[in-house]
Amino acid sequence: MERAMEHLNVQLNRLTRSLRRARTVELPEDSETAVYTLMPMVMADQHRSVSELLLNSKFDVNYAFGRVKRSLLHIAANCGSVECLVLLLKRGANPNYQDISGCTPLHLAARNGQKKCMGRLLEYNADVNICNNEGLTAIHWLAVNGRTELLHDLVQHVTNVDVEDAMGQTALHVACQNGHKTTVQCLLDSGADINRPNVSGATPLYFACSHGQRDTAQILLLRGAKYLPDRNGVTPLDLCVQGGYGETCEILIQHHGRLFQTLIQMTQNDDIKENMLRQVLEHVSQQNDSNYQRILTSLAEVATTNGHKLLSLSSNFEVQTKSLLRIIRIFCHVFCLGPSSPNNGNDMGYNGNKTPRSQVFKPLELLWHSLDEWLVLISTELEKEITDTTRSSSGNDIASLFLKKQEVDHSVSSENPQLLLDASSVMKTPEVYADGQDVISMIANRLSAVIQAFYMCCSCQMPHGMTSPRFIEFVCKHDEVLKCFVTRNPKIIFNHFHFLLECPELMSRFMHIIKGQPFKDRCEWFYEHLLAGQPDSDMVHRPVNENDILLVHRDSLFRSSCEVVSKSSNEKLKQGIAVRFHGEEGMGQGVVREWFDILSNEIINPDYALFTQSADGTTFQPNSNSSVNPDHLNYFRFAGQILGLALYHRQLVNIYFTRSFYKHILGIPVSYQDVSSIDPEYAKNLQWILDNDISDLGLELTFSVETDVFGTMEEVPLKPGGTTIQVTQDNKEEYVQLVTELRMTRAIQPQINAFLQGFHTFIPPSLIQLFDEYELELLLSGMPEIDVMDWKRNTEYTSGYDLQEPVIQWFWEVVENLTQEERVLLLQFVTGSSRVPHGGFAFLMGGSGLQKFTVAAVPYTSNLLPTSSTCINMLKLPEYPSKDVLRDRLLVALHCGSYGYTMA
């Protein structure tokens, strides 16, 4: 009985202690259960509770548990629970026990910077030289995290400070890579090998440069680190340039002066990213004026050498062109970062007024002189070609031209004659060079590339938007030769004569040649320059910032769109457009296309009085009375923005304008024929005046017209004093042109100006002038007719369908019998746009570029309608049992389901 009472008291005492401490007071006998009971206490460093539980327990403190098989000592070291750590050590915990990854408690304490735990572990003979499975010791962890204060305590216990991990990396390697200056100094003071290579031959300096660690690189160099490549020949400088680490590169050059020329020569290495190289040279040049002058002078010398190589027919044209233009781009970039100086067009010393800053261009004058000599000699030969009576003499003269040029150019590079034209090779291959035209065509590309370089150098010294007087003079001087070049090879315009797009005064000289090039080539040139410097404009492929989404309302699309576009950044709109209709989930390219499509219809909505329908009933012209809408000019500006945005992002709009309005956009003067779009009868009268002699008709016309101004007829002069100037047979053409401009331009000039202000926000005038009014209509609105055969040819099938399937054959039979309006509805239903791109269905765009019209099979159920995924131009067509059912369901979908989006 007494024993029973005693046992009961023990139980009650245990219960009381447990309840008071809110935990168990005895460890379970099962080790797995026991360790998970102790672990949270160890993590919280509740050493008294742990001590009490271990007091009368047989629990093995070295018991390994969990996936990585760690002991409680690992947990204490990892969490910094120093009291529990000491308790466990006193109870026999093994300080060198390794978990499944080979880590000891000391590794974990070092990794997490647990200084007190490290000290206690060392007191209990923790081995600092143990490596984990990756070969990392405790000092590697300290080096990775820059725990210098702990490293001082630990390094005295280390037998080999250069112990290597599995990749042959020492603690010094990783400290340099991570930029821990004091850690690097501590390791070096402790005898670390400053030039020790890892398995790939990379030294600590190599590691510092690979991550742009300027300060650690400087410490190493000051301590005598050698400049060594790895086993693949990659040097620390290579790494600095590849990463764009200008500061680290500067340190290398300070300690190894020879590397400056190595850096300059890297401008010719196409494997190095140009933007990284520019970044490095930009930093180095900005340190002092000496660096700035030296870099630019050296770049100019390298460019001159490359330019003369390019002028040699024995060199690789593609390689040398790319190299020259790359060097010149870098040169101009660095030059523009220099100190500002008066810029009056003479900065290159064209009139003997050289500034110190312009002296860096001096080496290039040799190349420009050679270019000028070439063009003069070719001009002379072309003149002879016109007067020569035999072709052989022309060929001989061209061969003489090469001989003469070699004599001139040998003065530039007498030490390396291979850089220049090999005249002997010209003479040895008369079958190639006998025709002077062939020789000129061969050298034209090379000279044109040098001309491009010359323009870049001239432009970088001029204020933005101004053309260098020297370059204009150069083009005018060699006008005939340059026109000869582009006539023989029009591709030169698109490849090298980019200056035409930036110099209106020069563009007019070549416009007739440019307009003669294929529309496709001009489109490519247009978009190449329009999108230059812009990232991928397809917002579908990157996360969309909610603040950048254009949230619009279907029931007030015009006004809500105008409001959100006006609040948006133009630069962000150029980068990409994301549209969401209020209350709808769908987003993506299909929604963007629909937005442009519907919005273009709203622009010509009579309620806004912006545009009026022309006489042909299909095109629109700005409304001269649009001022009835107080915000009409703001709305015209918005309309211009929308058309500019659509063209920028290659989206089609569902609107066609009069030819005269397209001319206004292009800056082309209107003609009297354009009047027919708004007043056909009046246009006929103007035509009659031009076609007939009016001398004796007694028309009594003056250079003025009567017009209704707010209900009152007023006489408006067509030019100053026009009311008193009679229209005669001699001046009737001027009269017709002026009256045309009054009706077609002056009457709507404010509207045109507002529209163009918005349009030019996204489309520069210099680019749009590459096209005529018919081509502009194609660019903006696509093909007006839908070619079913072209549609069929450029359709793909999936999910079990192919062209031979009965359902597909029925589908095309139905499409062929649809009205033009129904075909437009079908196209809009599937693609989100009611227009076919220029070039036909083969150029349909999807969310990721070109995406053909696709028909996918869907299992049929009664009354199931076709659906679509507009982002990928896919029609999901059920497997209908007959053509009649297919036609019925398709028409229901088209007439009732053309608008509205849900998530696919």
From Swiss-Prot:
Its EC number is 2.3.2.26. The keyword Protease does not apply. The active site is at 871 (glycyl thioester intermediate). Keywords: ANK repeat, Cell cycle, Cytoplasm, Endoplasmic reticulum, Golgi apparatus, Membrane, Repeat, Transferase, Ubl conjugation pathway. SUPFAM superfamilies: Ankyrin repeat (SSF48403), Hect, E3 ligase catalytic domain (SSF56204). The lineage of its organism: Eukaryota, Metazoa, Chordata, Craniata, Vertebrata. Residues 569-904 form the HECT domain. This is E3 ubiquitin-protein ligase HACE1. It holds the Pfam family Ank_4. It comes from Danio rerio. GO terms for molecular function: small GTPase binding; ubiquitin protein ligase activity; ubiquitin-protein transferase activity. Its main location: Golgi. E3 ubiquitin-protein ligase involved in Golgi membrane fusion and regulation of small GTPases. Acts as a regulator of Golgi membrane dynamics during the cell cycle: recruited to Golgi membrane by Rab proteins and regulates postmitotic Golgi membrane fusion. Acts by mediating ubiquitination during mitotic Golgi disassembly, ubiquitination serving as a signal for Golgi reassembly later, after cell division.
